[in-house]
Each structure stands twice: as C-alpha cells, then as structure tokens.
Amino acid sequence: MEMQRVWAVYFSGTGTTEKVVTRMAKIAAEDLGAEYKTFCFNLPKDREGELSFGPGDLVIFGTPVYAGRVPNLLLPYIRDKVKGNGALAVPVSLFGNRNFDDGLIELRNVLEADGFHTVAGGAFVGEHSFSRTLGAGRPDAQDMALVEELAHKTAEKVKGLERAPEIPAYVAGCDPIRPYYTPRDRHGEPIKDFLKAKPVTDSDKCVKCGLCARLCPMAAIDPND
C-alpha cells in the first residue's frame, strides 16, 4: 500500500511517549517516502475538536500506561473524537518499568473501533512519571534501537500490503480488558485513595510564572491559587 502521510500522534506528559512515537514515525515516513506530520494532545484545548484521518495515512498512536491500561481520562477523547476512516495505525504504549498489562491491547481495540486498521504494535519502557529511579533514563539507546527496528519492519509490512488488513494486529494482553491495576504497599495490602495524593509544595519558591498551570495536561492547577 502507498501512504501519503505518516503521523506521530501522542499524549506524553513527561516526554517519553513523544520520543518513541516521533522517532518511529519519522523512520517509517522516510522508508515509505511519505510526508511526516505530528499531533500532540497533551493539553485540554488539543482534545476539544475531532482528529480525522483517511486511507492514505499511517498513524503511530502513542499513550502512556497508567495502572496497566490506557489513562481513563484520555479514553473519551480517543474513543469519541479520533476518526480513522480506514487509515492504518500502530498502537504504542510506554510503561514505567512494571508492566504494560492490557494498555497496549486496549489502545489497539479502541483504535480499531475508531475505524483504523492496526498493522503492528509496541510497548516500551519509559522513566516512571512519579519517580526518577523507576526506569531511570529509559527509553535508552537500546530501547531506541528496538523502536527503530519496529519502524523499519512496520514500513516493510505496509509496503507489502495490497489492501488494509481486516484482522487487528496481534499484541500482548487480555481481552476482555482487565480492571485497572491496584497498587499495594510493602505488606501486600491495597493502597486506598492513592489518586487523592497531593504534592508537597513550597510557596516561598514559587515565582508566579504560571508555567505549571499552562502545561498541566488535565488543567488541574488553578493559576490564581
């Protein structure tokens, strides 16, 4: 199949998903002789309108994995406002060095339901968003070598297709999708209400620049507070 465009589409709060998805899309675009394009939906305003593709598009679509699944706050946007219209897609998941569980297969399923035809998929380790030690420095050079290998193999597969595949790409995970992973303490007990944790801040060090509020993916920071 001939592709006119290869897209890097991603949510990447800490930059690791962006690093993987953009690198993969750039290589695939070069191999396919196609235009390279990007769309980042990090901010709420980026998720307000529809995002539509077509048969001439190959979309490398990436999200992080939270608690073993696609982040639940992103699902309404991906499910309701992203339209494949027959485009090819590659779901990509970044996880913080525990396990991607059903994050990749869930993303694949949602993209298929959106009208994409998935042709490959990949999950990669990225430094954990809560810690500088979990998956520190990942994706590293070895990870990126695998990203590049997947990009080349994906482009080669697309070149060999006569038409869009009817069967979704095989990826690891359980279907039906399992519940979100429950974190546990050192004694194996479930940690309750961990989502209600609040960061400890030092207001004396705040210079009131407003950068944190402008960049917050969920618009959860009040710039006046």
Residue ranges and their predicted role:
Residues T201-D202, V207-D225:
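Iron-sulfur cluster-binding cysteine motifs and their immediate structural context
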Residues M1-P44, G49-G188:
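FMN-binding flavodoxin-like domain, especially the glycine-rich phosphate-binding loop
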